[in-house]
Amino acid sequence: MGEIKLIVGLANPGAEYAQTRHNAGAWYVEELARICGVSLVPDSKYFGLTARAVLHGKDVRLLIPTTYMNLSGKAVGALANFFRITPEEILVAHDELDMPPGVAKFKLGGGHGGHNGLKDIIAKLANDKNFYRLRIGIGHPGDKNKVSGYVLGKAPAKEQELINAAVDEAVRSTEVLFKEDMVKAMTRLHSFKAE
């Protein structure tokens, strides 16, 4: 694999969405920025909050789009084009309905699984699905008609603790990714489950 040069955390903008399950990807990028000692600042050129960080001597751009979720590709495309970053050098963190809270996994490629943020990113990357994802489990409401309200709702305290623990472990695994490689990062993260 090429090195990861752009890490994106998917979210909806604004205080009313900040603590909703759909913003789990942003929580991960915020924590990554914190441990790297950098601040995410608004940049209208890239339609989001951005920072330049260094992880184990390697440069990486951090991005949280401030478009709405279904327009995330606008931000990702703008930054990737400007810095000539290819899809396989991008890691997109997002909430994942098909995994329980307390679990997170890396993945290369695949479809969008109905996730509007991923759907728009794939479209804006000329239908190239070959980017990395960090899937952060939020669980499923059990009824597909309840999904929208579920992802835009806040998790109960115990579930939130589990999601936060998985996000923290994902950040530590990202350090392994930059220090070692994706295989070691996957091995570490995929054996983790918060209880």
Swiss-Prot record:
Catalysed conversion reaction: an N-acyl-L-alpha-aminoacyl-tRNA + H2O = an N-acyl-L-amino acid + a tRNA + H(+)
Family recorded in the similarity comment: Belongs to the PTH family.
Site note Discriminates between blocked and unblocked aminoacyl-tRNA, residues: 12
Enzyme class per UniProt: hydrolase
GO biological-process terms attached to the record: protein quality control for misfolded or incompletely synthesized proteins; rescue of stalled ribosome
Major localization class: cytoplasm
Subunit field text: Monomer.
Residues at the active site: 22
Stored CDD domains: PTH
Pfam family, one: Pept_tRNA_hydro
GO cellular component entries: cytoplasm
EC number: 3.1.1.29
This protein's record includes keyword Secreted: no
Keywords: Cytoplasm, Hydrolase, RNA-binding, tRNA-binding
Regions that span the bilayer: none
Site (Stabilizes the basic form of H active site to accept a proton): 95
Protein name per its UniProtKB record: Peptidyl-tRNA hydrolase
GO molecular function terms noted in the UniProt entry: peptidyl-tRNA hydrolase activity; tRNA binding
UniProt function note: Hydrolyzes ribosome-free peptidyl-tRNAs (with 1 or more amino acids incorporated), which drop off the ribosome during protein synthesis, or as a result of ribosome stalling. Catalyzes the release of premature peptidyl moieties from peptidyl-tRNA molecules trapped in stalled 50S ribosomal subunits, and thus maintains levels of free tRNAs and 50S ribosomes.
Superkingdom per UniProt: Bacteria
Protein's cellular compartments: Cytoplasm
Entry binding sites for tRNA: 17, 68, 70, 116
Gene that encodes the chain: pth
